[in-house]
UniProtKB/Swiss-Prot annotation:
Monomer. Keywords: 4Fe-4S, Amino-acid biosynthesis, Branched-chain amino acid biosynthesis, Iron, Iron-sulfur, Leucine biosynthesis, Lyase, Metal-binding. It comes from Mucor circinelloides f. lusitanicus. It is an enzyme of class 4 (lyase). GO terms for molecular function: 3-isopropylmalate dehydratase activity; 4 iron, 4 sulfur cluster binding; metal ion binding. It comes from the Eukaryota. NCBIfam families: leuC, PRK05478.1, PRK12466.1. This is 3-isopropylmalate dehydratase. Residues 537-547 have a biased composition (Acidic residues). [4Fe-4S] cluster binds at C400, C460, C463. It catalyses: (2R,3S)-3-isopropylmalate = (2S)-2-isopropylmalate. Binds 1 [4Fe-4S] cluster per subunit.
Length: 644
């Protein structure tokens, strides 16, 4: 059970000390309130000049080793069905409970169909694909065994994990937020330090509520000026990635700032932080301000009453100090940003809609020239081709990047009173059940269906195609998702990343088109802020202060016993050969494609490792030029791949 509770003032002052043991600190970082650690700062101390990232990081460091590795406390843990099965298995094997069930929120999103649920009975009968069904069933079994809060498919609050956290107020400023998912960076829009973790780390957080991490560098991207007509946050972040590249933020936490960012809504800020991963960063952050506070004010898990006032006072202190130092500074002029889209197979392959594809013959660097040619060959567009007018087969409006109510309103404003091109299959997938219900109250669903767009249920859908929503080989899609890698939305599928308005325009015209040339309707009755979310029974509000004894005495579910634990086995030490891979910013999709993620077993990477690079996707034949396939390398096992 997740509760919104408060901290007594005398406990909060102890958070100023860094020499407390983990268990002692944990009694103060209670439930969902370490987010707004009610610092009264009554104990004098020296305030260093710090960035937003510095402040949140420093407040969560429990211990630091000589090499800089830190043990940090984790405030929020979001869980879904794909990256959690092996983590729960590890807890069972060690006979451990989840340390903080009240700080953990789970849902299903990646594998589930987004077709109508009018006849939904249970996951077993609803999900037809066996591996997807198994992962979802396994999550439900683990939720029951370990006593966690769960938004299942029959729950109106179910949705994409990075949509439901913010709309419930589970995500709050100054928290550390993790999830076994790359796009956890979304939550940084609230001034939280949010980043994706691997399955082994998921297990570590479930067991200890801590992580071992090294501090990243500070990077500031300041966007100044008023955004031009037709330009959205999606265009801004695509432009930024085009400027700095997909490796530009490597090793950094990016703080997005400037008057352009300050003028954005929370939904828009979430879209930008969501794609900071595509810029190579560990996380993206925006300092909390009045826009943040107004968004959070009525959320079910936000502080209430006097706690709210104290929380806001603390949150306001998080902004980077005027003289704070950054390792990297980037300045962007908003006047330089037009409606932007991708032309190739990397988020850095961007041009304005008025631009054209590049010409490899004009690129001097041989590695870059080869990459551009490969991208053009895959995407099926010739060099120097104008992007406007490229025919599309499908339109996808959804994903954790662009599936919130603001995104749907923007798309509906373009679609209203028009019809989709007859050859286009267009789908709109709300990010959560609450977003879907709000859109239906506003009549957005009817606008879409009247135009021939398919109105779906909440889920990740076509963003990565682990569910039935996939592109067929050769199909071209205007997509509001975050990644356009080869095969991302389906084997052989071709993806162009665009804003919701640009996707809607492509659906109407049947081709990539400049939304600025489209008639855009007013959507009557649309509130400026996101809808107020109702507080439901599963969330308890507790106004009284909670002392430390009541925290550890709360019931915690214990997994089924597996007998006496034999203790943790000794670590295996591996030594081997480091093979060079001349590719920048290697992403998780490249390391292990999505089709190999549908397992609940600890299988290792095996044949999945760099599958798209090691094998021809059409024939399955081994690529003799890939580094791990070279016969000159000694016989070894590579991360689970045996090379004989």
């Amino acid at each position: 059970m997740i509760s919104s509770i408060s901290l007594s003032q005398d406990k909060c002052k102890y958070l100023l000390y860094n020499n407390l043991l983990v268990d002692e600190r944990e009694n103060f970082l209670v439930s969902l309130t370490c987010s707004y650690i009610l610092f009264q700062k009554t104990i004098p101390y020296i305030q260093n000049v710090s960035t937003l990232y510095d402040k949140v990081w420093d407040d969560h460091v429990i211990d630091q080793q000589e090499d800089g590795t830190c043990l940090i406390y984790i405030d929020r843990h979001l869980v879904h069905e794909v990256t959690s099965p092996q983590a729960f298995e590890g807890l069972r094997n060690a006979n451990r409970p989840v340390r903080r069930p009240d700080c953990t929120l789970a849902t299903v999103d990646h594998n589930i169909p987004t077709t109508t649920r009018k006849i939904f009975k249970n996951i077993t009968t609803f999900i037809k694909e066996a591996d997807s069904r198994t992962q979802c069933e396994t999550l439900e079994q683990n939720i029951e065994a370990f006593g966690l809060t769960y938004f299942g498919m029959e729950d109106s609050r179910q949705g994409i994990v990075h949509v439901i956290g913010p709309e419930q107020g589970f995500t709050l400023p100054a928290t550390t937020v993790v999830c076994g998912d790359s796009h956890t960076s979304t939550h940084g829009a609230f001034g939280a330090l949010a980043f994706g973790i691997g399955t082994s780390e998921v297990e570590h957080v479930l067991a200890t509520q801590t992580l071992l991490q090294k501090k990243s560098k500070n990077m500031r991207i300041r966007v100044q000026g008023k955004a031009l007509p037709g330009v959205t946050s999606k265009d801004i972040v695509l432009h930024i990635i085009g400027v700095i590249g997909t490796a530009g933020g490597t090793g950094c936490v990016i703080e997005f700032c400037g008057d352009t960012i300050a003028a954005l809504s929370m939904e828009s800020r979430m879209s930008i932080c969501n794609m900071s991963i595509e810029a190579g960063a560990r996380a993206g952050m925006v300092a909390p301000d009045e826009v943040t506070f107004e968004y959070l004010r009525d959320k079910p898990l936000a502080p209430k009453g006097a706690d709210w006032d104290r929380a806001v006072k603390y949150w306001k202190s998080l902004s980077s100090d005027a003289d704070a130092k950054y390792d990297i500074n980037v300045e962007i002029n908003a006047a330089d940003i037009a409606p932007t889209l991708t032309w190739g197979t990397s988020p850095q392959d961007v041009v304005p809609i008025t631009g054209s594809t590049p010409d490899p013959a004009k690129i001097e660097d041989p590695i870059r020239r080869s990459a551009v040619q490969r991208a053009l060959d895959y995407i099926g567009i010739a060099p120097n081709t104008p992007m406007e007018g490229v025919k599309v087969d499908k339109v996808f409006i959804g994903s954790c990047t662009n599936s919130r109510i603001e995104d749907l309103r923007a798309a509906a404003a373009v679609v209203k009173g028009k019809r989709a091109a007859e050859w286009v299959d267009a789908m709109v997938v709300p990010g959560s059940g609450l977003v879907k219900r709000q859109a239906e109250r506003e009549g957005l669903d009817k606008i879409f269906t009247d135009a021939g767009f398919d109105w779906r249920e909440a889920g990740c859908s076509m963003c990565l195609g682990m569910n039935p929503d996939q592109l067929k080989p050769g199909e071209r899609c205007a997509s509001t998702s975050n990644r356009n890698f080869e095969g991302r939305q389906g084997a052989g599928g071709r993806t162009h990343l665009v804003s919701p308005a640009m996707a809607a325009a492509a659906g109407i015209k049947g081709c990539l088109t400049d939304v600025r040339n489209m008639e855009v309707s007013e959507i009557p009755g649309t509130p400026k802020q996101s809808p107020r979310q109702e507080v439901v029974a599963e969330f308890e509000s507790e106004e009284d202060d909670v002392d430390s004894s009541s925290v550890d005495s709360a019931p915690v579910a214990t997994p089924p016993s597996t007998g006496d634990s034999a203790g943790m086995p000794k670590f295996t030490t591996l030594k081997g050969y480091a093979a060079p891979l001349d590719i920048s910013n290697v992403d998780t999709d490249m390391i292990i494609p999505k089709q190999f993620l549908k397992t609940i077993k600890r299988t290792g990477l095996g044949s999945a490792l760099f599958y798209a690079l090691r094998f021809d996707p059409a024939t399955g034949a081994e690529n003799p030029d890939f580094v791990l396939n070279l016969r000159a390398l000694p016989s070894r096992t590579y991360l689970g791949l045996h090379r004989s």
